[in-house]
Amino acid sequence: MEQTEEHTDTHTDEQDEAVDRNDRKERIGVVESAKMDKTITVSVRRQMKHPMYGKYLERSSTFMAHDEGDEANEGDTVRIMETRPISKNKRWRLVEIIERAK
């Protein structure tokens, strides 16, 4: 008789969760407002090409992000990452401050 070895998957749910967590969306933008407690408003700018005329236009989106330590100030360039819903409007959190406002 021949014995067969079963291949067991060494991947755990925790490892899958860690991979998913590292695969979240990230954006770089400028802090527009830091007046709220533990919350910043970040403006993310992007360029898009007009579908008919081909001109490049600048568009912006604003995101409310969680800033646990109230570290960011207006004008700072920051990196934000998508996260679970923290409140009605907050689905992003501050990862790092890239450049301080001058």
UniProtKB/Swiss-Prot annotation:
Quaternary assembly: Part of the 30S ribosomal subunit.
PANTHER family the record matches: 40S RIBOSOMAL PROTEIN S11 FAMILY MEMBER, SMALL RIBOSOMAL SUBUNIT PROTEIN US17M
Family annotation (Pfam families): Ribosomal_S17
Matching NCBIfam families: PRK05610.1, uS17_bact
Region (Disordered): 1-27
Family per similarity comment: Belongs to the universal ribosomal protein uS17 family.
Name of the coding gene: rpsQ
Assigned GO CC terms: cytosolic small ribosomal subunit
Domain of life: Bacteria
InterPro entries found in the cross-reference section: NA-bd_OB-fold, Ribosomal_uS17, Ribosomal_uS17_bact/chlr, Ribosomal_uS17_CS
Gene3D superfamilies: Nucleic acid-binding proteins (2.40.50.140)
Keywords in alphabetical order: Ribonucleoprotein, Ribosomal protein, RNA-binding, rRNA-binding
PROSITE patterns: RIBOSOMAL_S17 (PS00056)
Protein name (record): Small ribosomal subunit protein uS17
GO molecular function terms attached to this record: rRNA binding; structural constituent of ribosome
UniProt KW rRNA-binding keyword: yes
GO biological process: translation
Function description: One of the primary rRNA binding proteins, it binds specifically to the 5'-end of 16S ribosomal RNA.
Organism field: Salinibacter ruber (strain DSM 13855 / M31)
Record flagged with keyword Manganese: no
